[in-house]
């Protein structure tokens, strides 16, 4: 591992009734597997249907995401297997599961007895494989399986020799086609997991001393807190799939893989703190 971390903080505005405090943190980490145990070329940390793997291999970054994708020729045209009628495939290293870039921004604004705290959290540079979306596509539950439902599906490209190729899948055979489409090419269910989130917002009010004394207390605060309030940015592909970029379901080594985990929740609460 080789990286850098930067942390900055300051108070841009400090007036008698208004203050603005800010904190920023940035880190970047690069990893590279230098050696594995004798006799081991690839260490598989996790896997899914159709062969997607989270691996460690010498010369590659930690938690590399490897998966089959639809094969294309140098012109970008899909290559088909004439014997099966399906798209040909090839194994590819798509990205890493651990985000190399982490950033956080904290702002606290105070005006009189009120304060507002906003925490922005972001991660960049990683990818994640969604087993959930792969299953849903196999069973015809995603928009990827809409083409051909009314009049059949025509696929075209080149065969493995480079000759033009066309095949028509009748409506009655589409379940077979999409079952293969969803299982044989898991690379299409690997998403960029970049995000910027409003992680936390707190509105706090410091109760006046005159009111606190009525209950014989020293101080009191009332706070409205929200967690995971909004995704301010995520990649278009993962947004259209309706997925949260933080789709990891494990704290283990297989970062970059998600099964059928429960979605992230938004939490809103009120806290009253009284000091006697």
Spans of features found by a protein language model:
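Extracytoplasmic gating/loop element in the C-terminal half of outer-membrane beta-barrel translocons
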Residues: 123-221, 225-227
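Repeated loop/turn-to-beta-strand initiation elements of outer-membrane beta-barrel proteins
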Residues: 4, 16, 113-118, 210-211
């Amino acid at each position: 591992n080789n990286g850098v971390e930067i942390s900055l903080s300051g108070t841009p505005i400090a007036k008698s009734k208004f203050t603005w405090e800010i904190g920023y943190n940035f880190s970047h980490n690069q990893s590279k597997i230098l050696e594995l145990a004798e006799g081991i070329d690839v260490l598989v940390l996790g896997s899914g249907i159709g062969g997607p793997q989270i691996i460690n291999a010498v010369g590659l970054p930690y938690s590399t995401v490897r998966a089959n994708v639809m094969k294309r020729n140098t012109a970008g045209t899909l290559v088909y297997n004439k014997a099966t009628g399906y798209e040909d495939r090839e194994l590819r290293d798509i990205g890493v599961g651990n985000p190399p870039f982490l950033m956080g921004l904290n702002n606290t604004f105070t005006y009189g007895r009120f304060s507002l705290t906003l925490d922005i959290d972001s991660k960049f540079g990683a990818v994640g494989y969604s087993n959930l979306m792969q299953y849903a596509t196999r069973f015809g539950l995603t928009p990827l399986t809409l083409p051909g439902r009314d009049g059949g599906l025509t696929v075209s490209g080149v065969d493995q020799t480079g000759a033009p190729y066309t095949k028509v899948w009748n409506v009655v055979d589409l379940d077979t086609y999409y079952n293969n489409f969803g299982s044989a090419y898991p690379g299409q269910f690997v998403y960029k997991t970049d995000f910027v989130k409003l992680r936390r917002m707190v509105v706090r009010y410091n109760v006046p001393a005159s009111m606190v004394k009525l209950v014989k207390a020293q101080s009191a605060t009332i706070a409205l807190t929200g967690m995971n309030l909004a995704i301010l940015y995520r990649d278009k592909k993962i947004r259209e799939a309706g997925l949260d970029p933080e789709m990891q379901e494990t704290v283990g080594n297989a970062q970059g893989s998600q099964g059928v985990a429960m979605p992230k929740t938004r939490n809103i609460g009120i806290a009253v703190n009284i000091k006697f």
